[in-house]
Design a protein with these regions (language model features):
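Conserved core of the sugar-phosphate nucleotidyltransferase
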Residues: 128-216, 220
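Conserved N-terminal catalytic core of the sugar/cofactor nucleotidyltransferase
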Residues: 1-13, 27-119, 126-127, 131, ...
Length: 252
């Protein structure tokens, strides 16, 4: 079965202090998303789409894109996430600095997606097992009504070196019922994991809670659903919403 891996790499990396998606960290200069791409190819994916800012193209191709194509024979397609795309009804958004979110990112790759597809962040490490799991789920998705998500235990996704954003999941009988996007989750010195987005000492979270790291699987018909959802989102934006984003976990 043909399957596409869509990598969201256009984020600004503001918390990191640079473009984290193209920072070298492996023993031979690998960048983080390379590990996910090779894991995906081993899991049976046969097409890669990278969503980036136009200004990143030269660096991405030089750092690893051309090398992966040469080594594997797999073509990498590049999709540009820019604020004027899919926002014709609100032309003022073309000047927006902050990306419009992960739903918008996937829509920017729409022309390159023809098969069941998985979506990942460029700046997270997922592991081979996660890509195997989503690859096994994709053939079971029959329409836009079906989707899949690989979840992680919260305790395995936090760091003592800063806060993270995770989608805290509610499930029933193996089905995803709700995702609550939760910001500023921190592993505290006392060993507890807290949501620090409010005031005070924060809300203690269950370390065994299932969370999303944006590893989703979709039928290509889901792109129509995303387009309608994003259009509705755009029409709700106000002049004070410069940082508000349209997010996959919230949509789901």
């Amino acid at each position: 079965m043909d399957m596409t891996l869509v990598v969201m790499a256009a984020g600004l990396g503001s918390r990191y202090g640079g473009v984290k998606q193209i920072e070298r960290l492996g023993p031979d200069g690998e960048i983080l998303m390379e590990y996910a791409i090779y894991d995906a190819l081993r899991a049976g994916f046969d097409r890669i789409v990278l969503i980036i800012k136009p200004s990143m193209l030269e660096d991405v191709r030089a750092l690893f894109g051309d090398r992966i194509e040469q080594r594997t024979g797999i073509r990498i397609d590049y999709a540009f996430q820019t604020p004027e795309r899919f926002t014709a009804a609100r032309p003022e958004l073309a000047q927006r600095q902050k990306p419009l979110g992960t739903v918008h990112a996937v829509l920017c790759a729409r022309d390159a997606i023809e098969t069941p597809f998985a979506v990942i962040n460029a700046d997270d490490f997922y592991g081979r097992g996660a890509l195997d799991a989503i690859a096994a789920a994709l053939p079971q998705l029959g329409s836009a009504q079906d989707a899949a998500m690989v979840g992680y235990r919260l305790k395995n996704t936090v760091s003592p070196f800063g806060t993270v954003t995770r989608g805290v999941c509610a499930t029933q009988d193996g089905l995803l019922r709700k995702v609550q996007e939760t910001y500023k989750i921190r592993l505290c010195p006392d060993g507890l994991i807290r949501d620090m987005s409010g005031e005070g000492e924060g809300i203690v979270l269950d370390p065994e809670a299932l969370v999303s790291m944006n590893l989703w699987g979709y039928h290509p018909q889901m792109l129509d659903v995303m387009a309608q959802y994003f259009d509705d989102f755009v029409h709700t934006l106000t002049p004070g919403d410069e940082k508000r984003e349209c997010l996959l976990p919230v949509m789901m």
